[in-house]
Amino acid sequence: MDPGPGLAALQAWAAKSPAYGAANQTVVDKVPPDMMHMIDPHWYQFPPMNPLWHALLGFTIGVLGFVSISGNGMVIYIFMSTKSLKTPSNLLVVNLAFSDFLMMCAMSPAMVVNCYYETWVWGPFACELYACAGSLFGCASIWTMTMIAFDRYNVIVKGIAAKPMTSNGALLRILGIWVFSLAWTLLPFFGWNRYVPEGNMTACGTDYLSKSWVSRSYILIYSVFVYFLPLLLIIYSYFFIVQAVAAHEKAMREQAKKMNVASLRSSEAANTSAECKLAKVALMTISLWFMAWTPYLVINYTGVFESAPISPLATIWGSLFAKANAVYNPIVYGISHPKYQAALYAKFPSLQCQSAPEDAGSVASGTTAVSEEKPAA
């Protein structure tokens, strides 16, 4: 049976590497000599990966990079060029898109080239910069999402008593996010852990296989401040957000029964509904972020505690899921943000395949308007 040109091409790719399937060959054989000092002895026990995995990873990362760079670039352009979207709350959305945009600009092209050569080809210092960039932008993304959750908590739970976030307040939060993220990601350059090639040899990350507990402590403490603490803060925010929304809806239904009407919805209630919609969007985005980064955390903890063997193939999935995070945010906000859609279709009519959403259904801009009308505390 003829395998077809596509399968034949993949088989030819797999056959071109004499190392794959050969005896006494390891996954580190193609690593350049100037990087051998960075390779942990753990990886010498594994044979070369099937070139098909490198091809699949390179293709997937290339697609994710294209979608993320174009999608996040579009989000940044639309939000910054549309007057009605230039609100304090949306500055956090822009910062999130900016972080994801830079992540894929820094990581996707380099990894595609590495997958073609089936090893890291950019040298030791570029490996460290690559890993530092992934850590920096990942940290910035999760803390930006945490600030978005706090903003929703302030508007929805505290209501009219809340002090609205100003542009200066949003910019100060963004500055704090980047300073905090940069501080954590620079520490490995000063001896607390280090950045090394991962098991697939096409990406770089933190050294979670080190036997030194000083080095291991970086992984553990970093995960507390960049994974578990934001998670707890976000859960706290959304617990009270859901509680407040449920109480509001219950009060509305009870009042409607007393007045013998179907609904008490008014323009003010519509604004509250918009707040609830944005809370759902943010919660979805955050859930996708944790789905993306949890596999990488599990791999790091598995290495630190030596609870199970880690294969080069397993490290591929950690890299893939982590980078997929940069694709989720523009999709989520583009689908569920009517005012963003309206601005997008106005600037790029060719993208419109259905009638433009009504501007009155705005989510993010509507919530900001509610906030800005409140008196300062």
UniProtKB/Swiss-Prot annotation:
The gene is OP1. Visual pigments are the light-absorbing molecules that mediate vision. They consist of an apoprotein, opsin, covalently linked to cis-retinal. May play a role in photoperiodic photoreception. The chain crosses the membrane at residues 59-79, 93-113, 130-150, 170-190, 221-241, 281-301, 313-335. Residues 80-92, 151-169, 242-280, 336-377 are cytoplasmic. The keyword Cell inner membrane does not apply. One of its GO terms (molecular function) is photoreceptor activity. Residues 357-377 are annotated as: Disordered. Its main location: membrane. It comes from Manduca sexta. This is Opsin-1. InterPro entries: GPCR_opsins, GPCR_Rhodpsn, GPCR_Rhodpsn_7TM, Opsin, Opsin_lateye, Retinal_BS. GO terms for biological process: phototransduction; visual perception.
